[in-house]
Amino acid sequence: MAIERTFSIIKPNAVAKNVIGNIFARFEAAGFKIVGTKMLHLTVEQARGFYAEHDGKPFFDGLVEFMTSGPIVVSVLEGENAVQRHRDLLGATNPANALAGTLRADYADSLTENGTHGSDSVESAAREIAYFFGEGEVCPRTR
């Protein structure tokens, strides 16, 4: 299986619950290497840009408001089949449908405040990583 990179966000509601370390531990226990991470507070412009594909949808303004309501943690995870395995660990987007033991089952509050984000394809992962990480901010892992 090919080594992939995927993009992850720990959203404001999960950051506020002080579960960043718990989530990172679950990433590592699942076999992911954390090759880039940082905490930031999105501006409205950054949030609108990141979620531009949803502009015009009924939930867009609420999503932007939520994503700018507090700090987030963005990370790049590396591993075999990383995109799909990360999405499996996150659970269903709607936490009401998330299986027990997934991050959204454990840390989500609602459909919008679902605790985490994960790329849905290798292509979107590359785009999302480039949105938040510049040259030299993601480390190569050799071990």
Curated annotation (Swiss-Prot):
Asked if the Swiss-Prot or TrEMBL record annotates the protein with the keyword Nuclease, the reply is no
Q: Which organism is it from?
A: Escherichia coli (strain K12)
| Residue numbers annotated as active site | 117
Q: Which UniProt keywords apply?
A: ATP-binding, Cytoplasm, Kinase, Magnesium, Metal-binding, Nucleotide metabolism, Nucleotide-binding, Phosphoprotein, Transferase
Q: What does this protein do?
A: Major role in the synthesis of nucleoside triphosphates other than ATP. The ATP gamma phosphate is transferred to the NDP beta phosphate via a ping-pong mechanism, using a phosphorylated active-site intermediate.
**Which residues get modified to Phosphoserine?**
119, 121
Q: Which gene encodes it?
A: ndk
- Biological-process GO terms, alphabetical: CTP biosynthetic process; GTP biosynthetic process; purine nucleotide metabolic process; pyrimidine nucleotide metabolic process; UTP biosynthetic process
Enzyme Commission no: 2.7.4.6
Q: What GO CC annotations are associated with the protein?
A: cytosol
- Residues reported in the UniProt entry to bind ATP: 11, 59, 87, 93, 104, 114
Give the enzyme class: transferase
A GO molecular function annotation here is: metal ion binding
Q: Which reaction does it catalyse?
A: a 2'-deoxyribonucleoside 5'-diphosphate + ATP = a 2'-deoxyribonucleoside 5'-triphosphate + ADP; a ribonucleoside 5'-diphosphate + ATP = a ribonucleoside 5'-triphosphate + ADP
Cross-referenced Pfam families: NDK
User: What is the protein name given in its UniProt record?
Assistant: Nucleoside diphosphate kinase
Instruction: Name where it's found.
Output: Cytoplasm
Tell me which PROSITE patterns the record gives. NDPK, NDPK_LIKE
